[in-house]
Swiss-Prot record:
Protein name per Swiss-Prot or TrEMBL: Auxin-responsive protein IAA6
Entry-linked PROSITE patterns: PB1
GO MF annotation, one: DNA-binding transcription factor activity
InterPro entries listed in its UniProt record: AUX/IAA_dom (IPR033389), AUX_IAA (IPR003311), PB1-like (IPR053793)
Motif EAR-like (transcriptional repression), residue numbers: 13-17
Assembly notes: Homodimers and heterodimers. Interacts with TPL.
Gene Ontology annotations for the cellular component aspect, listed alphabetically: nucleus
Key word Repressor present: yes
Amino acid sequence: MAKEGLALEITELRLGLPGDNYSEISVCGSSKKKKRVLSDMMTSSALDTENENSVVSSVEDESLPVVKSQAVGWPPVCSYRRKKNNEEASKAIGYVKVSMDGVPYMRKIDLGSSNSYINLVTVLENLFGCLGIGVAKEGKKCEYIIIYEDKDRDWMLVGDVPWQMFKESCKRLRIVKRSDATGFGLQQD
């Protein structure tokens, strides 16, 4: 059953982006025009209602290229946000757990707030309320030594590597008595 004159081409499925200007299509031997784009309708209504001077300006407007509608899902905003958040997360150092021998609780500190080993030692002394915490370079003078767990789950002395490398690899801090810190390269008196 062929139904002529019902304008079924409006609901016809086609491949292509919305707003593409298709040439005339033929349905059952008759030639009809495809649905018009909004810009075409605006210029044709302007031609009907305006005088001769405005017709000349609208013809000049038609010579400009027609802007096609933006494709759905472009630009890929979600992947941009995901990538940006991953970059920010990698820049942010974050909090690490700190435990001390003889203290029944653990604390967390933000390594990003410290800018050197000296500043880190000061923060830890204030946090646990004790003096005499030191890093590897001043190990003989201190009662306590700070060790840290790196990405490879190895325990190392704080102060053996440059500060930036320490911030990137530190997962956990532990404050131990100097006498208990054997196997870390400290020389006993």
